[in-house]
Amino acid sequence: MNRSILKFVKNGIISSSSRINNNGFINKNNNNRWFATLPQPNRGIAGEKQPIYLDMQSTTPIDPRVLDAMLPLYTENYGNPHSKTHAYGWTSNDLVEDAREKVSKIIGADSKEIIFTSGATESGNIAIKGVARFYKEKKNHIITTVTEHKCILDSCRHLEMEGFKVTYLPVGENGLVDLELLKNTITPQTSLVTIMAVNNEIGVVQPIKEIGKICRENGVFFHTDAAQAVGKIPIDVNDMNIDLLSISGHKIYGPKGVGALFVRRRPRVRIEPITTGGGQERGIRSGTVPSTLAVGLGAACDIALKEMNHDAAWVKYLYDRLLKGITDNIPNVKVNGDLNARYYGNLNISFSYVEGESLLMAIKDVACSSGSACTSSSLEPSYVLRSLGVEEDMAHSSIRFGIGRFTTEQEIDYTIEILKKNVQRLRDMSPLWEMVQEGIDIKTIEWSQI
């Protein structure tokens, strides 16, 4: 494949160049692996000040190799993949099918089981609403957990308004679902269980294989929101007995606006479409497939599959470095979620006696989050953390750091230093912290209500 890489220049024009390392795109390491070298925090692509990016659960930067794969579809192979009467359509269709094959390989599926969508939100809506409505005459019960992504919870709530019964399973303090409780909750009326693979807020990895086994033994379809899992942890839909699986492009260094839904063919999962039209994508998702975005998703999956072990080792190394740097230098902190059953690109940690939003503003040179980007406009404490039993003040003090493929040691070290400085500064302003330093147990204080 041509390794030419796109370079952003100051006037906004995109030009093709090869093996660039001046202000930001290509370096080659000792392992013959190509990396995009992202701009340092004191300069952006066009030279402006840019913060360090540690919000990988919100979105990831597009891998330059993905961008490279997409460019020809903007300039040469721009045909509609559904046009069957000329070469433009044939070429575009071939590229889309090649991308479909690459997406299928990363989860061990058949390419015919991959449906292109606009993202994981649409995939989740199709899976949950589509299965529930198709089988509603026979079964009307769905099971999920209280810590799912908003798109899953809202889909279930909409089904409740249509007359379906939904059970929202609690999770333990570690964020994991109780398998015995799941098993005992399934009834003859249960059509679908939907439990996410990796939680977007706390990084906890659910026991997907065990959940799939329970569902298969009980004749219940199993959907998992794998937006935060695909390309990060190994997934095999057959070994794990997964029937439906949601994928997001921009969570794996691919483009925004594209995703995929795996729909099992044997045993066949039937879906009532929620979008009608031209009958594309096996009639499940009508609408012209955005061939450029689909190819980008395919390229992202191909890279992620080949480099998953390397990425995982790098992310774990940086996670350990960040966690040690925080815990060695800042007292009274707590990691949220299970310490072992987790994806190490996600560190959600609470800083006692510090308001999370205040800390985010104080460390503005680091782009991170106090929770899901989908709910970040709300000042309410995270519903995921509250579901774990985290006290409200600790939930308010949580920060999520997202580590990824292109994160550097220098960025982690800078983050540790800026946290040390600003957590202490904010605590010094807190009368509660002063009382704790004096040995007062503030939980025993009866505060007057005025």
UniProtKB/Swiss-Prot annotation:
InterPro entries: Aminotrans_V_dom, Aminotrans_V_PyrdxlP_BS, Cys_deSase_IscS, Cysteine_dSase, PyrdxlP-dep_Trfase, PyrdxlP-dep_Trfase_major, PyrdxlP-dep_Trfase_small. Its cofactor is pyridoxal 5'-phosphate. The keyword Transferase applies. The keyword Ribosomal protein does not apply. The modification N6-(pyridoxal phosphate)lysine is found at residue 251. It is found in: Mitochondrion; Nucleus. One of its GO terms (molecular function) is pyridoxal phosphate binding. The active site is at 374 (cysteine persulfide intermediate). This is Probable cysteine desulfurase, mitochondrial. The lineage of its organism: Eukaryota, Amoebozoa, Evosea, Eumycetozoa, Dictyostelia.
